[in-house]
Amino acid sequence: DSPTPNTYNIYYGTAASAXN
């Protein structure tokens, strides 16, 4: 539960969702 993977997941998750 680190802030690094959390932000990475949110950033990529949003980009993937929007993109997709």
UniProtKB/Swiss-Prot annotation:
Keywords: Chloroplast, Plastid, Thylakoid. It is found in: Plastid, Chloroplast thylakoid lumen. GO terms for cellular component: chloroplast thylakoid lumen. Its main location: plastid. It comes from the Eukaryota. This is Thylakoid lumenal 18.4 kDa protein. It comes from Spinacia oleracea (Spinach).
